[in-house]
């Protein structure tokens, strides 16, 4: 009788606990949980990564063009520079085309990355560049043009038709769910620059109500990903507007990004003083921070100045571009209006390495390596603008 009573109470307790656990999973991490997660990580430092022989995320991941040998070589170069994370873009069309094969290739990538002590951040959706992604062979780069083949996810056809949204839900739940407990992954970036109008020369192809559709879809994407109870944090990075400190002054997409993210991420391609002010604006949210896009040399955002500042402020730092290749992001954004076909830019815009693995500037590689070896928040002398070893006597 006592055992039966005890079992009855246990059944009631479990029944009561289950909805509570489910409710917790449906909410962003507590600030304490986010801080505890960050405390266990190395200071995140890396690049936005696509292999140099891929023009976009489709060419990176499709079975016919997936190149593990090149990825292994390039991530080996990254390891030698002290890089411990890479931000890597996925695509819903890849999952629709070949669910099992796509997940196997993700697993292969993760195995290669783990071999080089790199934990990637995977990006599920992206609102930038070509709004009409098409599977199969990708077009060659447009000469002299920045990111001339990058594609959005989802594309206009899907975004414009809510009947496709259940398939997007299945994609998010399957990808996140399949790797929800995989410690080789650092985080999930659910949507890159969701309220970006696209960029490039694609304005006529963008939905007129793109912002409204994304604003409605983004909270659902967070919910779909969170329903899989991943051990990795979710995030989506704010990237524009003058002040991120006051939610009431931000648009609906930005409010979702800042209130639904487990850790805060942001993009900044400005001078050091502006970068520092952006970090200060985001401090009030009380969560760990990663700058998931920076470094535009000719715009004032450099490895020499911004990366040590991020380290001092204990902000993870992920620059745009690793090996110069088919994305052509050594060319600046204005190349869409003025292609660099006659001569290269005076200074590379993005990217760290030549195609053969030689650093564009050895000093940048030295700074990244020195910063990655130092404790969080510590900028070693070797990473300062004028290290003692370089002093002129």
Please report, for each region that a protein language model flagged, where it lies by residue:
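Cleavable N-terminal signal peptides
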Residues: 10-11, 21
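Active-site mouth of glycoside hydrolases
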Residues: 25-261, 267, 272-274, 285, ...
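Extended, alpha-helix-rich binding/interface surfaces that flank or overlap catalytic cores
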Residues: 331-391
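Bacterial N-terminal signal peptides that target proteins for export
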Residues: 1-9
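Low-complexity, Gly/Pro
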Residues: 23, 122, 390-393
């Amino acid at each position: 009788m006592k055992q039966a009573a005890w079992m009855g109470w246990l059944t009631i307790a479990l029944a009561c606990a289950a909805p509570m656990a489910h409710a917790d999973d449906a909410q962003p991490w507590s600030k304490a949980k986010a801080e505890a997660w960050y405390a266990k990580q190395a200071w995140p430092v890396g690049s936005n990564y696509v292999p140099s022989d891929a023009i976009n995320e489709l060419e990176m991941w499709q079975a016919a063009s997936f190149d593990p040998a090149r990825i292994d070589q390039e991530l080996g170069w990254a390891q030698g520079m002290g890089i411990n994370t890479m931000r890597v873009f996925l695509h819903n069309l890849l999952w629709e085309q070949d669910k099992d094969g796509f997940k196997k290739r993700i697993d292969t990538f993760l195995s290669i990355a783990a071999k080089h002590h790199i934990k990637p951040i995977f990006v599920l959706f992206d609102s930038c560049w070509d709004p009409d992604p098409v599977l199969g062979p990708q077009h060659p780069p447009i000469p002299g043009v920045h990111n001339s083949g990058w594609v959005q996810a989802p594309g206009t056809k899907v975004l414009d038709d809510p009947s496709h949204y259940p398939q997007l839900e299945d994609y998010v739940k399957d990808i996140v769910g399949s790797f929800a407990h995989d410690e080789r992954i650092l985080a999930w970036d659910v949507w890159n620059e969701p309220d970006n109008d696209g960029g490039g020369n694609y304005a006529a192809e963008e939905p007129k109500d793109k912002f409204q559709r994304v604003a409605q879809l983004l909270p659902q994407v967070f919910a779909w990903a969170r329903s899989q109870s991943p051990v990795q944090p979710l995030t989506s990075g704010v990237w524009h507007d003058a002040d991120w400190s006051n939610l009431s002054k931000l648009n609906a997409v930005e409010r979702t990004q800042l209130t639904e993210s487990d850790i805060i991420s942001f993009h900044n391609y400005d001078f050091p003083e502006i970068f520092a002010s952006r970090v200060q604006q985001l401090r009030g949210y009380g969560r760990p921070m990663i700058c998931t896009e920076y470094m535009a040399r000719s715009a004032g955002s450099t490895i020499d100045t911004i990366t040590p500042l991020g380290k001092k402020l204990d902000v993870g730092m992920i620059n745009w571009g690793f090996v110069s290749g088919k994305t052509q992001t050594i060319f600046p954004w204005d190349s869409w209006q003025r292609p660099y076909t006659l001569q290269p830019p005076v200074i590379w815009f993005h990217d760290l390495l030549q195609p053969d693995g030689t650093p564009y500037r050895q000093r940048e590689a030295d700074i990244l390596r020195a910063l990655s070896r130092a404790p969080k928040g510590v900028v070693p002398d070797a990473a300062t603008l004028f290290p003692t070893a370089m002093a002129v006597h």
